[in-house]
């Protein structure tokens, strides 16, 4: 553990410590409008209910809070706090929004400066394709075929908000800014409880999106920081003595005895002596840790993660949050796809002169499918169908024009197909397309007090073209006219689009209203 602390201090000493006296001065307004950071566009803060707050309001509120009379009145009259006065909800919400989002702008400034620290003459390579979350799946398809075990990690959440403040102390030296952060977090949670409630986290995430995103990303970066430390220490074990593990000592002695009896039999290093390469992939609060090692080694990694999180973050990680499975016998849910690596058996007939025989070939394949139940549940929550998948009309949209209704339904359908284009089986997608198409027709029929058949006959091909997805256009160009191909088949061609930067809202039911 002392070695980890030394490694942590060494890595963090390379970073420039951030000083934040600007938070309580008017220079925040000029600094946030620096041309190197944001160009000529002013900084706009998006709050709840799509409200916009300029950084000028942030500056004025900070100056007002910095005045002595404001805080004296708050101390002498705690029930009449101007910021947290629940009797005047508008000002309470307005001030907390401005100040919290203003704090998020300030703490993001050093990270923006770090991106501009490189010389202008040095060309910085841009990997725009790697910004897509779909770029993860080609990586998994290339690597997971050679791995054996898979660990599902759920980053512990929610946690005590004081831990978030303590993690920022590594980078923030300004004490008043940390007190201000505690002031906000105390407003949204019960400070005396060890674990905050999901209601407090939901309020903090909904009303202060920018601040919550920064705090959560800071916490995740620290979580991955000590995970990287464990990975580096694991890779260094091959250069040191293997006497730290009892089973390695026994195995080494057996191999030495075997080498005396059969000299020259083993000319190469056996993979058991080398810690396998670990692959780590994360999105939001879920992560995957895969390796080629043994089950015993994976259990050790699980123990390391639990113990380190208990020591470093001062909370207990439930062991069931880390699930260990064999890769070929399980499937994992990640980014809205149900992925697995099944073993397919292939019989090949080999003809040699007059003799022929069958060869049983076993091949691994990275398979990605779309789970039907969660998506139908999301459509049901959005009031497009019932819980069993029966399409219904959407009365909320009946006040819109016909073309707006068609455009909304068609856009949802195209977005679903676009996001799930990497599915090896399209049957679930066409079922969702049928639900959206019939729901659209029933919405239009309800608006005009008519029947569904009447509207289908009136619109004709125009109604179908709105639900004609981009992926189907690509497949129509790939296959010739002589090829018997049906869009409603179960073809396994997959397309990974590299322009998707976030998960689809229907994939994550928590984002739906």
Curated annotation (Swiss-Prot):
Q: What Gene Ontology terms describe what this protein does at the molecular function level?
A: RNA binding
Is Plastid one of the keywords?
yes
* Locations listed in the record: Plastid, Chloroplast
Q: Which cysteines are joined by disulfide bonds?
A: none
For this record, the Gene Ontology CC terms, alphabetical, are: chloroplast
Keyword Lipid biosynthesis among record annotations? no
Q: Which InterPro entries match?
A: Domain_X, Maturase_MatK, Maturase_MatK_N
Q: Give the GO terms filed under biological process for this record.
A: mRNA processing; RNA splicing; tRNA processing
User: Which key words are in the record?
Assistant: Chloroplast, mRNA processing, Plastid, RNA-binding, tRNA processing
Pfam families noted in UniProt: Intron_maturas2, MatK_N
Similarity section: Belongs to the intron maturase 2 family. MatK subfamily.
Q: Which HAMAP family match?
A: MatK (MF_01390)
Q: What does this protein's UniProt record list under function? A: Usually encoded in the trnK tRNA gene intron. Probably assists in splicing its own and other chloroplast group II introns.
What name does the UniProt record give this protein?
A: Maturase K
The organism is Molinia caerulea (Purple moor-grass)
Q: What is the lineage of its organism?
A: Eukaryota, Viridiplantae, Streptophyta, Embryophyta, Tracheophyta
Gene designation per UniProt: matK
């Amino acid at each position: 553990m002392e070695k980890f602390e030394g490694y942590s201090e060494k890595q963090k000493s390379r970073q420039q410590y951030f000083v934040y006296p600007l938070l309580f001065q008017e220079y925040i307004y000029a600094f946030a409008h620096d041309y190197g950071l944001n160009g000529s566009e002013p900084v706009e803060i998006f709050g709840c209910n799509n409200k916009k707050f300029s950084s000028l309001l942030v500056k004025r509120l900070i100056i007002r809070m910095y005045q002595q009379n404001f805080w004296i009145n708050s101390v002498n009259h705690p029930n009449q706090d101007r910021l947290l006065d629940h009797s005047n909800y508008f000002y309470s919400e307005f001030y907390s929004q401005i100040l919290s989002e203003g704090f998020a702008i300030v703490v993001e400034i050093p990270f923006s400066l770090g991106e501009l620290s490189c010389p202008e003459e040095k060309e910085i390579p841009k990997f725009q394709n790697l910004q897509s979350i779909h770029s993860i799946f080609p990586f998994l398809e290339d690597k997971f075929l050679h791995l054996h075990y898979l660990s599902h990690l759920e980053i512990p959440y929610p946690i005590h908000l004081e831990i978030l403040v303590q993690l920022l102390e590594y980078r923030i030296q300004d004490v008043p800014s940390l007190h201000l952060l505690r002031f906000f977090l105390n407003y949204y949670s019960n400070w005396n409880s060890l674990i905050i409630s999901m209601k407090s986290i939901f309020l903090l995430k909904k009303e202060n999106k920018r601040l919550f995103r920064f705090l959560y990303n800071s916490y995740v970066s620290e979580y991955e920081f000590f995970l990287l430390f464990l990975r580096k220490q694991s890779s260094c074990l091959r250069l040191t003595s293997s006497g730290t593990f009892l089973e390695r000592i026994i195995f080494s002695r057996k191999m030495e005895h075997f080498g005396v009896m059969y000299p020259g039999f083993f000319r190469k290093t056996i993979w058991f002596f080398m810690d396998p390469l670990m692959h780590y992939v994360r999105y939001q609060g879920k992560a995957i840790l895969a390796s080629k090692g043994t089950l015993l080694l994976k259990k050790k990694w699980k123990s390391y993660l639990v113990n380190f999180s208990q020591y470093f973050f001062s909370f207990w990680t439930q062991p069931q949050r880390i699930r260990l499975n064999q890769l070929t016998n399980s499937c994992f849910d990640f980014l809205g796809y149900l992925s697995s690596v099944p073993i397919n058996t292939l019989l090949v007939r080999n003809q040699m002169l007059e003799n022929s025989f069958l060869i049983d070939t076993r091949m691994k394949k990275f398979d990605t499918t779309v789970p039907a139940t969660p998506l139908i549940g999301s459509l049901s929550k959005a009031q497009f169908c019932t819980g069993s998948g029966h399409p219904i009309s959407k009365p909320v949209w009946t006040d819109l024009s016909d073309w707006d209704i068609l455009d909304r339904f068609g856009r949802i359908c195209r977005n679903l197909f676009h996001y799930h284009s990497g599915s090896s089986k399209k049957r679930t997608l066409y079922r969702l397309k049928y639900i959206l198409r019939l729901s659209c027709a029933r919405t239009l029929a309800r608006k005009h007090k008519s029947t569904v058949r009447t509207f289908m006959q009136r619109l004709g091909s125009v109604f179908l073209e709105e639900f004609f997805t981009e992926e189907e256009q690509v497949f129509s160009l790939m296959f010739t006219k002589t090829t018997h191909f049906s869009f409603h088949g179960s073809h396994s061609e997959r397309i990974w689009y590299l322009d998707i930067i976030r998960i689809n809202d229907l994939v994550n039911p928590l984002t739906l209203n």
